[in-house]
Amino acid sequence: MAYSIANNHLLRKTFTKIKNIIDIPNLIDIQKNSYRRFLQQEGVSESRNNTGLEAVFRSVFPIKDFSESASLEYVSYSLSKPKYDVVECHQRGMTFAAPMKVKVRLVIWDTGKESGIRAIKDIKEQEVYFGEIPLMTDNGTFIINGTERVIVSQLHRSPGVFYDHDKGKTHSSGKVLYSARVIPYRGSWLDFEFDHKDILYVRIDRRRKMPATVLLKALGYSAEQLLNYYYKSEEIFLTGETPSKSIDAELLTLQKALVDVVDPKSGEVIVKANRKFTKASIRKMVEHDIKAVPITFDSIIGRYASSDVIDPATGEVLLECNEEVTAEKFDEIKAKGVESFRLLFIDNLHITSSFRDTLLMDKISTNDEALIEIYRRLRPGDPPTLKSSLALFENLFFNPERYDLSAVGRLKLNFKLGLKVWPECTVLNAPCMFGAEDIASFDELFRLLLAADNRFSQYVLARLPEDFVKVLRKHEPSQPVAEKLREQLLKELNNLVKDPDFYQKELFTGLALSQQTVALTEAIEGGVFEENRRVIEVLRRNRMIFEDLYAPVVLTSPKNDILEIVRYLIDLKNGRGAIDDIDHLGNRRVRAVGELLENQYRIGLVRMERAIKERMSLQEVENLMPHDLINSKPVSAVVKEFFGSSQLSQFMDQTNPLSEVTHKRRLSALGPGGLTRERAGFEVRDVHPTHYGRVCPIETPEGPNIGLIASLSTYARINDHGFVETPYRIVLDGKLTNEVRFFSALEEEGHAIAQANAEVDAEGRFVNDYVSARKSGEFILVHRDEIELMDVAPKQLVSVAAALIPFLENDDANRALMGSNMQRQAVPLLRADSPLVGTGMERIVAKDSGVSVIARHNGVVESVDASRIVVKIDESEVDETGTGVDIYNLIKFARSNQNTCINNKPVVKVGDVVKRHDVIADGPSTDMGELALGQNIVVAFMPWGGYNFEDSILVSEKLVKDDRYTSIHIEEYECVARDTKLGKEEITSDIPNLGEEALKDLDESGIIRIGAEVKPGDILVGKITPKGETQLSPEEKLLRAIFGEKAGDVRDTSLTVPPGVEGTVIGAKVFSRKGADKDTRTELIEKAEEEKLRKDEQDEIRIIRQSAEGKLHRLLIGKSLSVKLEDGEGNLILAKGKEITAEALKSLSINDMGAISVSDDGQTDDNVSKVIDTLNRQIELIQSVFEDKIQKLRRGDDLPPGVIKMVKVYIAIKRKLQVGDKMAGRHGNKGVVSRILPEEDMPYMEDGRPVEIVLNPLGVPSRMNVGQILETHLGWAAKGIGWRIEEMLQKQTSAESLKAYLKDVYGDDEVGTFIDGMDQEELMLVCRRLQRGVSMASPVFEGASEDKIKSMLGKAGFHSSGQVTLFDGRSGDPFKHKVTVGVMYVLKLHHLVDDKIHARSIGPYSLVTQQPLGGKAQFGGQRLGEMEVWAMEAYGAAYALQEFLTVKSDDVSGRTRMYEAIVKGKHTLEPGLPESFNVLIKELQSLCLDVELLEGEDE
């Protein structure tokens, strides 16, 4: 609870009652983990998992040429060190990226002319440069062309199968039509749908629909197989006097008895006619040995045959499969002596005839016709052949290259349909796979070979000798295989493997082969073919053969994916099963950086694959090396385009630390493959029950993107499948445990989950019998024994920004939304001040955002100044390669993406002990390691002379004087000298036609000095550009010849300060081309940088020397010498045998100490030389690192083509608070500063303290954000307690009573112990810090109650109402009523009036219309629209209006006449023709209307 790093950490009094079970996961892990998984930078290729970049390479390679005489295989990839580090990339506008090399192998095959056997002819392996891949910085961002960017995670629809209905809107009858859609990760979409006549149709890729049975027949199923797959059938017996049917318990329970069912022996009636069959009656029938149930003749008529009924005598088909039984047909069947036949069970109540009707209307009967029909639908106009139809169909859903469900899609399909297919199987119609562990023995292979429905076994058995197959077939699969049979089978298989014909056939059409070759090779090698290495040799040589030999472990599943998808859809129609909710988070998943980039790489590699194939076929492959084939340009281009211009690659919002963190945790439903703003409906944007604890229900933008862009909740994380998970505590047998597990939305379904604030006793049992809980999206009251899970914390519901709002529970959600969005726009202030009333999240955000400097190791602070901190690491933490010193170079006044100022200031002092992960320097908007976005301000809620009408804010001048709301903004200006056609541009201070005054701040290189104060129009960098040569008159030529070059051939193109910018130059950077001469300014900058590096180097060496000296002293002092000890000049210091003292060692260098020999067992001497060796090695390491850095510094820069020199100038602008600036609280209460009032005029309290801001009380009730009032009261108490501590210090109260008061305030045993343990000095330090107010934490949904606030007000010595009498600062009279006064945390937002205000007299004009441009950026004018003209007309201001519409706008000649008139002092206005009139005439003429303007003299 209490932090102390040299006691400068804040103690926060917290109001939470719930103990912390699990820390909030690192806030930017979502980005870092995803990219780490994608890059797998650490691993070597063999150990890398098949994910991310590795998976892309493995899936695209090997690339074979068209004749398959050569193949290019992928071996591994490796990344080198990036050329520039993060800081350099920022400065030079480079991309922070690492060069990538890929090792590939080109294998050339030789195919024998006669035998057709392929053998390896040649193998060439080579590392090929494969472009650069951007790296992620430690803070989860990318640096692209010098700017920090964030890749936002995308929330998209998960692959899998989705069932839905049209809610009765499609057909006029209002009938509900069901449909199913299979969405793959990539590949063709498959839709099944019913029409209003209950016929089932299928669409492939949203093409024209066809009966679904066409697709099923194309899979190779006959009509009879399909009917019997989807329908149960009953056997009808015709042997007795009346017909009867078989007893099927499942079907009978759905029916009534048509006639009495009688026990033939006793004559007892078991089931009466027209009574339903029950489970009991069926059991009774079985007990009485009744085999069939009597039925009536009528019940058979109108039913359908489940298979052909055949005349037993002639073999003639009497009744076809799916044909209706009529009276005539029935008589014929009976007459022909058929004893029994089977009918489909369709009762149109539980089971409808829709599938049977579809089969009936489908005119296609064979597999081949179905394939051709599908080809016709997908490729209309192409003449179909059976071969092309088969190839197309195979590629649609069964070819892993064209169709990929992804592991997630397979998982969802298995989950929905209850299948047990291998997760590696990412195509449809997938066979069930046996894992390597399933092939336990040879017997297993045997069983698989003899499995009747295995296409591989059929293929193999057809090629083995017939007599051997007979022997095999006799073998009982459950019995072990005899030795002799085993040998014989191996021999036969071996012959097959050698036989080239074995591989000729298209073996596995429609079978997917798992990519996990390794596990299975081992299984086949280790278990199955142990005795026969020959097979494996062949396998090794030919990967294709190898995959074919996988087939022993392939068993085609009787449950085919597509059949099961259709079955579920039919069940839905029959009233079983449930449709899917596409907004459920189990059906939406997150694609984070890694996956998005993986997809881009795949696109690039596929493009490259085409190019490689073409090259292989065009040139002689045998003479080529891999690098001749591979051109990585397409891949680099795709990646570059993704980072540069993808919708999901965004310019990082760097206004303050919170906005950075939030941007990295954002989830967007937009972007490629996602939704579009215009088409997204209400449902997608709405909050869904599964968002609880996963996606924040509050934080989302206002406007068109509302609900499409969301933010991850505080505890949420993303699992390997891309689903969002949230943690819950496990409840076992009604008792709460401390075990925490993460659940995705699907896993959480059906569990009863208690709220985090449910009351629990000391043993973890729920206090109340009935507890409020969530179950399947509903809030219910559940008995405590039924609770299975419990939330970990109340704030797990909301995102980081919303969790920073105290008393969030008392705000209206719409206002909370504005509050969380506006905190992200708070400008970092000059003096950061952490909130008195916080939520306890401030420290976590500041730490995880990466803006503050965090200690890397435990250690002691050696030295501190404004720009760096040196920490000597504890010896226990120094490893072999480390130097034992951490140097933290602090960032000073750097510019952020939003032009705010990034600056680190140390919070430690020399001698402080720091622990790993401690904050040692604050960043922007952080105070003592806590987020500090605004200021704690004393506010009063009252009207004041109309200056706080409608959300205006009245501010005291004191805030401006004290610089409470002053912020620094840094602008960067760039000047580039290019090589032009007319000559080189030059950066110089020698600029023609400019006086001394204008150039006074430039140095001789033409660059402004640091520290210069600049105004609009001042020159920052002097630059001249050659002019085009003009024709000179003879006189001029003569003069030129006589007087030499005149400055007439260059023009001034200097970089000047734009309008509206005033500030101080704080930095200049010069980049010059390699090989170009350096100017003096560049040399100065380089020299300063070099000195800084040298200082770091010397400090590092000094500290490790000191530490080595310390070690040597500890080793040597107290030991006796074995040889005499002399100094460098030969003077005796200690005689032999004397004991070594600290005094004696003082004058010796480290090397001298190395020469000391001690009389012990040699252990000390060894240790001494070890210390010295380590020291020398570390010094060498440090020196080489710094030499590299200095070399880099002296090298020229890589500049874009045509650029000779580039100068960047940085100007710091100090912005004080002024009228027109936007301010806001944390509860969505925003306003604009309307007046800055002198301090003496502000309302003041009885003790003379004036308030600092006056707010309008009417802004609270209608907006329903009462949280701000509670915050004000609690803040008032916090401030009051601070004042009381100040009083006590002034009165020099005893330490005991101070401690007692503090313990009373904090009321926490842990803090109590901490306070008791303080000495006088520490106590004073803490109390001085607390004078500004005691920091409190009121976490969301478990904040301070009203009673607690009143008790805190009491401790501060205030009235419990929180109201005081105020006096008018102007008259001194008290106001009539008491006023609510307190402390509120108020932010200054990034909408500053200085950035928006703008004025122009003359400026740029549009080319065509000659009207002034618009907008501040273009230095544009003010538009006068239609309505403004009406207003001017209403006033009768005719001349002003004429001026507006002509000379001030687009009357070009009138404009020049106007200038003349002003210069000459005439005040006449002669308007001419506006240019836009000419445009109008030209437009009319372009429409072939002959319009002319006739100008005549005035009559």
Curated annotation (Swiss-Prot):
Key words, A-Z: DNA-directed RNA polymerase, Nucleotidyltransferase, Transcription, Transferase
Subunit details: The RNAP catalytic core consists of 2 alpha, 1 beta, 1 beta' and 1 omega subunit. When a sigma factor is associated with the core the holoenzyme is formed, which can initiate transcription.
GO cellular component: DNA-directed RNA polymerase complex
Enzyme Commission numbers on file: 2.7.7.6
Similarity comment: Belongs to the RNA polymerase beta chain family.
CDD domains referenced in this protein's UniProt entry, alphabetically: RNA_pol_B_RPB2
Name of the molecule in the record: DNA-directed RNA polymerase subunit beta
Function statement: DNA-dependent RNA polymerase catalyzes the transcription of DNA into RNA using the four ribonucleoside triphosphates as substrates.
UniProt-listed NCBIfam families: PRK00405.1, rpoB
Listed Pfam families: RNA_pol_Rpb2_1 (PF04563), RNA_pol_Rpb2_2 (PF04561), RNA_pol_Rpb2_3 (PF04565), RNA_pol_Rpb2_45 (PF10385), RNA_pol_Rpb2_6 (PF00562), RNA_pol_Rpb2_7 (PF04560)
The protein's enzyme class: transferase
PROSITE patterns given in the database record: RNA_POL_BETA (PS01166)
Residue ranges that the Swiss-Prot or TrEMBL entry lists as coiled coil: none
